[in-house]
Amino acid sequence: MASIETLVEEIGKLSLTEASELVKALEEKFGVSAAPAVIAGGMAAAPAGDAAAQEEKTEFDVELKAAGANKINVIKVVRSITGLGLKEAKEVVDGAPKVVKEAVSKEEAEKIAKELKDAGAEVELK
């Protein structure tokens, strides 16, 4: 037993490259493969609803649905959020519904949505 523990300790000290070489040498020596075995029939797929419930969305898109009555203030907010020029920001607002910001954290998306709503826009997080 002591020799097995010593062997495990020595293997633990190997670098990743050395460990890879060890695996290749053992595969050749014993005629085996380190690849996982394929099970006939495979695993049962989990229902899609369960996976969606377990996995919380981490990235959100902020979509401008409509500019509302105060279009000028919405354009100003879109400019500050996106860094676009006046013409480009106006095109985004006029072309609503449009995504204003993509793949942002939940907190940032909520902050952006609040700014746009305060300016009079209709906003949706996706």
UniProtKB/Swiss-Prot annotation:
GO molecular function: mRNA binding; structural constituent of ribosome
GO biological process: translation
Single GO cellular component term: cytosolic large ribosomal subunit
Keywords associated with the record: Ribonucleoprotein, Ribosomal protein
Keyword NAD: no
UniProt cross-references to Pfam families, sorted A to Z: Ribosomal_L12 (PF00542), Ribosomal_L12_N (PF16320)
Transmembrane segments annotated in the record for this chain: none
Record NCBIfam families: L12
Function: Forms part of the ribosomal stalk which helps the ribosome interact with GTP-bound translation factors. Is thus essential for accurate translation.
Subunit architecture: Homodimer. Part of the ribosomal stalk of the 50S ribosomal subunit. Forms a multimeric L10(L12)X complex, where L10 forms an elongated spine to which 2 to 4 L12 dimers bind in a sequential fashion. Binds GTP-bound translation factors.
PANTHER family: 39S RIBOSOMAL PROTEIN L12 (PTHR45987), LARGE RIBOSOMAL SUBUNIT PROTEIN BL12M (PTHR45987:SF4)
Protein family (similarity comment): Belongs to the bacterial ribosomal protein bL12 family.
Protein name per the record: Large ribosomal subunit protein bL12
